[in-house]
């Protein structure tokens, strides 16, 4: 599931004229179409609320980037997305997905190097190897360990 929320009293502005239902039925990725991530989201899971609440050129925040679905939705809908991800392997997945879709090079803002240049520096001779993403069919690790009966 994906959630959208706000702090009471700070409801986001409505920029679209249509009124939408609070739940949506969206298609999921077929197993063979997943972009190297166990739970990729359909682009409309992010595109619908973007179009409803964020003006073109506006900013969206993505604290759990995963395979980059919100980045891709922002690209498709003319919104900016500030994203982060704890897993370096999934950053590679998201950046490579964006580059493949847009035909552009991702640029490191700090010094202007491309993603490819940074990858070569970090991986050396293995720079052309695909990102070592976790098994997309494996169950994600639970957030908490179950309590043991002692």
Can you annotate each of these PLM segments?
Residues 32-35, 120, 145:
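Positively charged, low-complexity intrinsically disordered regions
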């Amino acid at each position: 599931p994906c959630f959208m929320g706000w702090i009471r009293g700070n409801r986001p502005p409505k920029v679209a004229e249509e009124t939408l239902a609070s739940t949506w039925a969206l298609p999921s990725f077929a197993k063979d179409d997943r972009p190297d991530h166990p739970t990729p989201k359909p682009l409309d899971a992010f595109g619908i609320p973007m179009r409803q609440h964020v003006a073109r050129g506006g900013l969206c925040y993505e604290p759990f980037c995963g395979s980059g679905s919100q980045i891709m939705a922002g690209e498709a809908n003319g919104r900016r997305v500030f994203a982060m991800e704890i897993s370096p392997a999934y950053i590679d997945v998201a950046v490579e997905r964006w580059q493949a879709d847009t035909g552009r090079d991702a640029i490191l803002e700090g010094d202007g190097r491309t993603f490819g240049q940074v990858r070569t520096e970090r991986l050396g001779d293995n720079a052309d190897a695909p990102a070592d993403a976790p098994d997309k069919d494996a169950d994600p690790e639970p957030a908490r360990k179950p309590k043991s009966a002692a």
